[in-house]
Amino acid sequence: MGDDSEWLKLPVDQKCEHKLWKARLSGYEEALKIFQKIKDEKSPEWSKFLGLIKKFVTDSNAVVQLKGLEAALVYVENAHVAGKTTGEVVSGVVSKVFNQPKAKAKELGIEICLMYIEIEKGEAVQEELLKGLDNKNPKIIVACIETLRKALSEFGSKIILLKPIIKVLPKLFESREKAVRDEAKLIAVEIYRWIRDALRPPLQNINSVQLKELEEEWVKLPTSAPRPTRFLRSQQELEAKLEQQQSAGGDAEGGGDDGDEVPQIDAYELLEAVEILSKLPKDFYDKIEAKKWQERKEALESVEVLIKNPKLEAGDYADLVKALKKVVGKDTNVMLVALAAKCLTGLAVGLRKKFGQYAGHVVPTILEKFKEKKPQVVQALQEAIDAIFLTTTLQNISEDVLAVMDNKNPTIKQQTSLFIARSFRHCTASTLPKSLLKPFCAALLKHINDSAPEVRDAAFEALGTALKVVGEKAVNPFLADVDKLKLDKIKECSEKVELIHGKKAGLAADKKEFKPLPGRTAASGAAGDKDTKDISAPKPGPLKKAPAAKAGGPPKKGKPAAPGGAGNTGTKNKKGLETKEIVEPELSIEVCEEKASAVLPPTCIQLLDSSNWKERLACMEEFQKAVELMDRTEMPCQALVRMLAKKPGWKETNFQVMQMKLHIVALIAQKGNFSKTSAQVVLDGLVDKIGDVKCGNNAKEAMTAIAEACMLPWTAEQVVSMAFSQKNPKNQSETLNWLSNAIKEFGFSGLNVKAFISNVKTALAATNPAVRTAAITLLGVMYLYVGPSLRMFFEDEKPALLSQIDAEFEKMQGQSPPAPTRGISKHSTSGTDEGEDGDEPDDGSNDVVDLLPRTEISDKITSELVSKIGDKNWKIRKEGLDEVAGIINDAKFIQPNIGELPTALKGRLNDSNKILVQQTLNILQQLAVAMGPNIKQHVKNLGIPIITVLGDSKNNVRAAALATVNAWAEQTGMKEWLEGEDLSEELKKENPFLRQELLGWLAEKLPTLRSTPTDLILCVPHLYSCLEDRNGDVRKKAQDALPFFMMHLGYEKMAKATGKLKPTSKDQVLAMLEKAKVNMPAKPAPPTKATSKPMGGSAPAKFQPASAPAEDCISSSTEPKPDPKKAKAPGLSSKAKSAQGKKMPSKTSLKEDEDKSGPIFIVVPNGKEQRMKDEKGLKVLKWNFTTPRDEYIEQLKTQMSSCVAKWLQDEMFHSDFQHHNKALAVMVDHLESEKEGVIGCLDLILKWLTLRFFDTNTSVLMKALEYLKLLFTLLSEEEYHLTENEASSFIPYLVVKVGEPKDVIRKDVRAILNRMCLVYPASKMFPFIMEGTKSKNSKQRAECLEELGCLVESYGMNVCQPTPGKALKEIAVHIGDRDNAVRNAALNTIVTVYNVHGDQVFKLIGNLSEKDMSMLEERIKRSAKRPSAAPIKQVEEKPQRAQNISSNANMLRKGPAEDMSSKLNQARSMSGHPEAAQMVRREFQLDLDEIENDNGTVRCEMPELVQHKLDDIFEPVLIPEPKIRAVSPHFDDMHSNTASTINFIISQVASGDINTSIQALTQIDEVLRQEDKAEAMSGHIDQFLIATFMQLRLIYNTHMADEKLEKDEIIKLYSCIIGNMISLFQIESLAREASTGVLKDLMHGLITLMLDSRIEDLEEGQQVIRSVNLLVVKVLEKSDQTNILSALLVLLQDSLLATASSPKFSELVMKCLWRMVRLLPDTINSINLDRILLDIHIFMKVFPKEKLKQCKSEFPIRTLKTLLHTLCKLKGPKILDHLTMIDNKNESELEAHLCRMMKHSMDQTGSKSDKETEKGASRIDEKSSKAKVNDFLAEIFKKIGSKENTKEGLAELYEYKKKYSDADIEPFLKNSSQFFQSYVERGLRVIEMEREGKGRISTSTGISPQMEVTCVPTPTSTVSSIGNTNGEEVGPSVYLERLKILRQRCGLDNTKQDDRPPLTSLLSKPAVPTVASSTDMLHSKLSQLRESREQHQHSDLDSNQTHSSGTVTSSSSTANIDDLKKRLERIKSSRK
């Protein structure tokens, strides 16, 4: 015990250090008493304890420590020297006190820290506390934060430095410990109390939920400025003063002092400056100067990323600014100008005043660039110049600005004035002195008198701002000469201006802070938005637009921005964008109630929280109705959603009410300006309900609506974080499911990949299987966008889970992400000036990978690691490499900065240890994947050394090196490798391995490039040396690479490069070059073109086994079976077979059976399409060779590996031919059961069979041909259409085999060629076979010529390609062949053609030698054949072929141009009549007398025959004149295949089969929609329009009356027609080709359609009529104005003449004319006025004034007067000079009317009234009335005499006689022949019978009276018009002509008919010029071939000026036809 008490004797300081706790406790107690007693703070007593205070606070005994803390507190409070202990004591407190469980200890520790701050040691304390935040013990961290918070609360932000605290805040918010996060939240609230919104930017990236919580807390804070409650010792007096003031109630002065103490914190000051200059890409300054805009863009984008840092470190930015300035000033690409301006803005904002030194250089360039008018460029420039202004002063840039003020460009002047106005707002009276103001005012005063209003307005605004800043007194001297109006305007502008100088410090800073932030941070807080508005409010210019510009900022590349939400908002209005991006301030519940009550019914608000669920439901219904009726601008979204959230809110128990609630949320989000603040009110509730069975769907809908309003990235982040903060697994799984679907709908752009990956990992670790499944599904969707790199993030997962993820990824393999359907509603790609959208079709994943977080690993590449890699000991080197591999593997994705690693790895590529070399290569592969495209900066220093390794002697090392080079090239592209001399230097090395590998690599890569650097030429000399290398493999590789070098460099350059070679070498190399020139592939097409086909509907219809080809409405309707079923069939059948086969397996063969049990061909979705795409893009070798080389075989093997069973592939590529036979036998067996597989792999099967053609074994060849026969039979049954790719890689090799010496093989090949025509157009087969005639093998030539003859015999002349003329000339050449068999074959082929087409063949074959010609003539004589019928084989023997063509709708565009006319007729005859073609020909051979006299039994076919005959004769003549005869060989000789294809398709437009017509229209629409192809339609416009209105008439008369026909089909057809017409009339050059007659008939058809009441009754009828309206407007505006005006006048004339025409029709025609009149002022100069006046003259002649006045409506006369008045007004007296085309001006009143109008307009005094004029006119009328009657009758008789107008003339004569019964027409008949007189009398009798209802003729012809009434007669086209169904009589000459046409079409001779005059000779020449009917122009191109005939017609027409010939023929014709009709009538009645 004695020992224990010894310490009692010790002094206090020793007790305090004693090892016994009791001694220490006693010592501390004594010390405390001592400290309390010492009154003098400078007493020496204090110093004794100076070294002990740390021990006081760090005592190990908790009880003792408490006492020590008390003593330490007193010491610090009173001792003068206490400050010296700050560091160690506070450190002790942090580490040993803050971790104590006792609250008292912690409180004392905090008090000690605060006391140190009070004694002015705040910095040291803060430093130690911040160190404490890094401690691992959360208790310590919490206590440190609490201490800092208390210190800030008590001492204020002036004493406690906020910047270091704010810097660590985000890290604290990420802590796992809730206590730490809670304490961080409290300190953030405290900091916000002191600095307000300056805290927002640093916290933008914390978790959104935490940010939301902070926002809620911040809103609760009082708005009054905070005050410190505790003061430093030096401020104790101030504290005393403050207490005194508080006791006295305070005064203003105290408040003022206090206010001064609260510092104004600038957020900029709180940010860390970032150094960006060193981070610029090394090649930046080269790229910014590059010729390619894409490279310049890449350089600018790299700067754009760097300048997003809000605060930049000072440095030398001169070069960077200079480069950006150059882009702004000189770049022609506006997109890059805007991007460079954006970069300058970022630099100015980030550097602030440090940028001022560069301002003077940049400002003039920007001001000059304002000449650019594109809004996005102007906006970017405005933002840039505004940001730059804030870095300098107006004085500094005044000279530059004033210099631009005199620019002539008004846009520059306007924008400069606006900039001055904005600059003035930042000035004060002191910063805008008179010396500065004077020059600006002088310049602006010039602008207020500018001619451009926008310049004047901008100048007024600038002067008004100056007035507001410096006051009237300072400005008035400069405004002395300004007039009052302008002065008032300046003052008005001045009143509107809001200045910034009053709050300059704060707001300018805020402006700088927040302007860039929306682009740099994902979300912005409420106050930040408020500030942005405050700044931008007074500025109409760029500051207001800043948020809009930035909103679409983050996604940089064109393609990915499109699917996402962010990039697509560009076209929406700016305001809408701001509301989306800006979070509105949170409203209090009172404000919300007030706003809601203003828009909702009162009962609704009251019943929201009713206890009765029915009342709540009724309330919700009212709520919904109110929301539906609200306008977007009036809807208070936040107030409404807060009302919904009001009790019971989301805890609503009734599911019906809850469903309504959720639906209303969705409605509000869709209809209102929904902000993120509103979203935050409801999202928690939605997430809570998403898992609900009844309400889940509604919750998802609401979320989707919110995502559309607030953008998906933000919404998704909120929703997922909320879901995972809950513990409900159902909610979590459903949230992930919703997100999967949302990504597909919105696209992936802007999504925070990192955040989702962490959430998905959480979900994958969940115990609930539904959550895991949902997470895996989400990963699958993300995989679509991110690609294989996504898997890297989940490699650490459990194997079972990883296999599930892999399975999901496998499902998505090959699929492309769907196009976004949401978030792009009003999007138009206006921002992509260079068409960027198409530039990157499939590389969206690369852009998404850019979003993935990349790790900085440079700090891990330490010098130790580098020295390890370079160590002498290989084991240590290996360790170093292992470490590097581990670093890269852990990081997954890395940043390009990798320190000294490239140098270290480069050394290892030359390592003597080959294992290490391989390991290094593996690391380099890893590096390429991890670094991505950024690896390109390491190509020169690390990539080229990899190529050196290709020269290694070991195979495996070379293979690894090649794989590495490919991995790098995949990331970098080839440009970096080919630039410079590095590659040529490698090739120069005489290492055979290196040369082989390098040349092989280049041969693989060069074909895929569109362009290469010029440095490629440097490789050529070394390539030539490789061609002569000793090593054979090197030579072979060099030869293979030669065409690809030539592809890029061209033959000339390559040949020129041989100049330096030795003469012997040169000759050899040149020979090789010639050979390579033949095999040189074309350069790959640009991606835009490549992608345009799949994007549009124009891609060929490829067979898709997995899904029915429903893209085309026609082809899908003809598909007999849906493809999915087919796809399943083989699987089932093969399983069934295998089950049977496996009943009794022997053990030895079990494995083999299992291997062979499955299908032999595997259906790979889109596999064939991908292979075609690869071949087209030259990614693989094109299947084109003379003999198959190894690389082709290897390529085919590789392609087959994915879709052919392995065991079969082994057989197919076995070296033994017996295995080939075995493979073919298996393929034959599986042919029927695996149709889909065969079709899916058809291209590969055919290629493999071509290889078999080169085998010498006959049995294999026979087996292959047997298989081919079966294969093509199957394909034709399946109606499959061979693709171009399949055909071109197979047919040439098959054609070679036709020359085999064995007859049996030749016979089989011919049979196969014959069957191929069932699956591939004969016209496309023709060129392949024609190519075969050029062979050296005479047997092949002979067989090919025979096959050509068969094709012509079967399919007609149009099968000949490119034209019959060229084809026959080539065939005729072989008549002179040395081989007899070839000569005979050529002669037989031409004889075949002769048998089909007669003597025309001699014109086509051209000049033959006398010998050849005599041989041909002799052969023709010997054949003893008259020309027979055209090929009927295609109808009779090839029905399958016809179906195949029609069913493959998409192929018609490319499809066969052969045999067009015959196919068209065949289609018509098959659809319209069941009879065969021969029966149609017998129609004109009927013996009518025999039929008439035959009263016995009728032959079974007679009724059909007669009925057919009647229909065909008396229905309107479908094919007028001889103009649609079969397309003759002459036509093909003159026109290309394209023209004939278009003719064929146009002919199908008028088809009676709706599907055929729709197909044709679809194809034409494709052509019209592509600008580069639309020109192909030129010259076919009339033909196309005729076919179109023929179809319109057909629909009107036939289809609409057909009850069996689906009306939807008719609507579809109408839609196609109208869509086509609109496309056509949007192309002005094509629209102007339409002629008058065609336009007239087209307008007739369209107006008839608009008036069709049957259409209005259909469901979509109104839409059709609206579309027609639109089309009519297009026709009127875009057609040739003369033609359309003329057409309308003629149409009006016809409609007024026609008795059956409705008034409504005429009215619509007149409306069209009125529209044309309105257009006249703009179009008068382009109109042929002479022609129009001639048409008006004819109109006025037919309708004199009296007759017009008799019309029921006054509109016709008003229309005519208006038209003439407008013409007079526009042309003046010159109009009278345009009557040149009128022969007899007295025939109408036109000239008199024009004279009156001119006289009236020129009479200035107005003395002559209109009445006098009219009286004068009436006197003239009276004098001429008698003459008029005679003229009128003469006109009628001329019409009767004219064949065209005979019917109309008779009708008019009948009307005239009926009206004027006493009229004498004898004088007119007296001079005519007896025939003519009897014809007129009989015609009048017939009309009388018709009018009185005795419709004998009508009924006998089978034409319904209804059709008579509905059809409007068109007098100018009675014979030829399709719609002519009103029972007109038609002369037999018409039938004779039709017979002639039909005979010619069928290939019959017409020579016997030559004595009959042609149809046109039977027509009299019309007395007045009439508009040629549209159908007269059909096939107008044939006119050149009928020149001789036309001359004959002209002579006939001239001779027919008198009536005699016409009338005789006419009357005899009528007599004959009447007789014919009567006889037919008797036949019919006798059969009844």
Swiss-Prot record:
Composition bias, Polar residues: 1971-1983
UniProt GO molecular function: cadherin binding; microtubule binding; microtubule plus end polymerase; microtubule plus-end binding; ribonucleoprotein complex binding
UniProt xrefs under Pfam families = CLASP_N, XMAP215_CLASP_TOG
Q: Where in the cell is it found?
A: Cytoplasm, Cytoskeleton, Microtubule organizing center, Centrosome; Cytoplasm, Cytoskeleton, Spindle pole; Cytoplasm, Cytoskeleton, Spindle; Chromosome, Centromere, Kinetochore
Where are residues bearing N6-acetyllysine located in the sequence? Answer: 48
User: What PANTHER family has UniProt attached to this entry?
Assistant: MICROTUBULE ASSOCIATED PROTEIN XMAP215
Put simply, this protein is called: Cytoskeleton-associated protein 5
Q: What is the lineage of its organism?
A: Eukaryota, Metazoa, Chordata, Craniata, Vertebrata
